[in-house]
Every structure is written in C-alpha cells, then in structure tokens.
Amino acid sequence: MITIIGPTASGKTTLAAHLAASFIVEGQPAEIISGDSRQVYRGMDIGTGKDLCDYEVTLPANTQHPTPTTLKIPYHLIDICDPGEKYNIFEFQQDFLKAYEDITSRGALPILCGGSGLYVESVIREYHLSPVPKNEELREELSHKSMAELTEILMDLKEKNNSDMHNKTDVDSPQRAIRAIEIEAYNLEHKTEDRYFPPIETTIIGVDIPRDERRRKISTRLKNRVDEGMVDEIKRILDSGVSAEDLIYYGLEYKYVTEYVIGKRSYEDMLKELEIAIHQFAKRQMTWFRGMERRGCKINWIDAMLPMEEKVRAIRETISPPSPSPREGSSPLTPSRGSS
C-alpha cells in the first residue's frame, strides 16, 4: 500500500489520483481509500472539500489514443453515511479493512490518502480499538460541566491512559469533549490485548507545502467555497432535519457557518474566524505528522511545488528504486520533516 498524507490545501488528493493513473496506464489497477474524517458524509461536499473531480485524470494524446482521455480513479470511504451520524475511528478502521481487502482481492494497488492524521495513523500503527458504547449516566453527569472542567477531566484521563489518541479538536465543543471523555474512560477500564488490527506494509509519502503558499491556498480556497455555495449547502442540511448542534460537532466550516446561519455570528466574523481556524488546523496537521515520525513512522516528504509529473516519478522511484546511476542533484523525496 502507498499512503499519501499532507495538510489541507497541499494537493494530496490530486497527487494520489495522478499516482494511481500512472499505475493504471501500465496495466496495474490502483484505487484510492480516503482517510478524511468528514468526507464520509453524504451532502457535506463543499465544506469538506470533497472535490470529486480530483479523482479524474486527463491523459494526453498518444499513438494509442489520438485524443486526450480521462481516467476516473475508483475511490472508497466517501459518501458512506448521513449528516448527523457520529462516524468514529473504530468504524473507520473496519471500513478501511473492508475496502483494503476488496481492492487487494482484485489485484489492485490501494492508495490511502488523507489529512486526518489520527485515522491514517490508526491503520499504519495498527491501533487496537474496540467500539465504545454510549454511557448515558456519564453523559448526564458531564452535561452540567463547563468546557474548562471537561478539558481538565479529559486531560487527566489521557494521562492515566498514556494516550495521544485524540487531538485538540476533542475540546472544540462540549459534545466532542464528552464523547472523548467517554472513550478514554472506557479504555481505562478495558484491556486492549485482544483488540487486533492486521499489520499492513506501506510507504508513506508526505506532501510538504511551504507555509506561505499553504496559507495563500487556504485563503483562496475558502473564498471559492463561499462563492460555490457553502452557506447554502449548510442551510440545506439544517433544513433536512440535522440539528445545529450536530453540524457544529463536525467543526471548522460546519461549526462557523452554522453559527452564522443560526444567528450566533455575523457574516464578517464568521469568515474571519473560520479562516483563522483553518490555518490553525493545518498547523496542527503538520504537528501530528511530525509526531508520527517521532512515533516511528518513516515519512518521505515531497515538495508540493514540484511539477506533477516529477512528483509522481519521484514516488515511483521511492517505491521501486531504479538502478544506481550518476545523476546531478538529490532526490525530490527526503525523509526529513515537513514545513510547520
């Protein structure tokens, strides 16, 4: 398996699709497994950046095909549940395994691609997880706590569990914090020895985009998403019966735009605070990936600014290194850490 990770707006999905296409044209089928925690939801398209056109790769004309042709790269774990549901890491692991086994059983190459570091790492490092049932008694007890109190309880449980299983988004809202506490409390009382996840060999490629370029692309993309109808998309989801609380639970675009729609924020404040939050999120993603390296994951970083053809070639050479030959310069792929 090949794994492609990177912060938001780094172009990792487009890279994964072009990489898959490079195998397909050689007769080796390849399919993408999404490692995004929000693109699993149907109808949450603009806010999650679910650009399905990224999975279409146009190939130039050649002797066999006199006109350009478009390859549609098969993808998995996108649009698999409804807004309002609470998809979690355990479900992701199970769905990932089903997709992985389906792809490999047909002789195709799986490419895991995503920016949700926790989800991706749960596969790479074989997290031993089990479903955590709802604890209504605990939820009732916690429902009267302030965010500061919930955060303190969560940090205490994490320390007892020696856990880095959840990131800072756990305390974005009381609902998220309570669920995180519920999970940590359950794991504290239940042993993990019998929770098996099969080892999967993978080469990890990290897309390293310069900080200033990342910020520019995030700002541009946010403006484009607003122009494409992100606010209307969220209004439609609310009108379909999904509660504001449930949408806020999904964070970032769905949190800030929902708060605008229900009158908790002005339009200008929503845009300003959302842009700041996305920049902070991208920085946390890079922090997580650096943590993966410290936890033993070898990440081969590639410069996002390289031409697509060169990036694909460098990845292919990393997977199957060519015979040594004199060449100028160094490889575009390096095992050093990416930009923060």
Language model features with spans:
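Phosphate/pyrophosphate-binding catalytic cores of soluble transferases and nucleic-acid-acting enzymes
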Residues: 1-320, 335
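Glycine-biased, low-complexity coil/linker segments
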Residues: 36, 324-329, 337-339
